[in-house]
Amino acid sequence: TAEWMCQQYEDLNAQYYGSAVEKDDVMSYEWARIPHFYNAFYVYKYATGYSAATAISKKILTEGKPAAQDYIRFLKTGESDHPIELLKIAGVDMSSPLPVQQAMETFNQLLDEFESLL
């Protein structure tokens, strides 16, 4: 129920923020405006977008101008086709596991670098 969700959200806010955030009358309803909670397949877009962006940036950094030109061509296509097809113009095949694997490798490298600084 909405009442249950309000209570859960209020409890989580109290757990996360403690007394650092002053509760008001409408804070408990904030969950209802967050699409992650009720739109199916909303959150996966972040991971796939990050994976595609990582693959594109790696191509540009390693291949230089030709990859940058492919990226510009991709941007110019707008919404003329399905995103998976359009990304192929930029040299990224999201129907294969490679872009996600590369993004995870990049994330692991950055995490290792961060941990070495601590």
Please state what every model-predicted region is:
Residues T1-L118:
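C-terminal, non-catalytic "cap/extension" segments appended to globular domains
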